[in-house]
Amino acid sequence: AWVDWEDQILQDTVPLVNFVRMI
Protein backbone atom coordinates (compact mmCIF):
# COMPACT_ATOMS: atom_id res chain seq x y z
CA ALA A 1 0.00 0.00 0.00
CA TRP A 2 2.81 2.40 0.90
CA VAL A 3 4.66 1.65 -2.31
CA ASP A 4 1.56 2.30 -4.40
CA TRP A 5 0.99 5.53 -2.49
CA GLU A 6 4.56 6.69 -3.10
CA ASP A 7 4.29 5.79 -6.79
CA GLN A 8 1.10 7.83 -7.03
CA ILE A 9 2.80 10.82 -5.39
CA LEU A 10 5.79 10.56 -7.74
CA GLN A 11 3.53 10.36 -10.78
CA ASP A 12 1.85 13.58 -9.66
CA THR A 13 5.05 15.31 -8.51
CA VAL A 14 7.48 14.61 -11.37
CA PRO A 15 5.38 16.37 -14.07
CA LEU A 16 4.91 19.27 -11.66
CA VAL A 17 8.67 19.57 -11.06
CA ASN A 18 9.33 19.45 -14.81
CA PHE A 19 6.71 22.16 -15.31
CA VAL A 20 8.37 24.37 -12.70
CA ARG A 21 11.81 23.81 -14.23
CA MET A 22 10.48 24.98 -17.60
CA ILE A 23 9.60 28.30 -15.97
Swiss-Prot record:
GO CC terms: chloroplast
Compartments where located: Plastid, Chloroplast
Keywords (A to Z) from UniProt: Chloroplast, Plastid
Disulfide bridge map: none
Keyword 4Fe-4S applies: no
Function: Has a function in the early stage of chloroplast development and palisade cell morphogenesis.
Protein name, UniProt field: Protein DCL, chloroplastic
Organism: Pseudotsuga menziesii (Douglas-fir)
Native organism taxonomy: Eukaryota, Viridiplantae, Streptophyta, Embryophyta, Tracheophyta
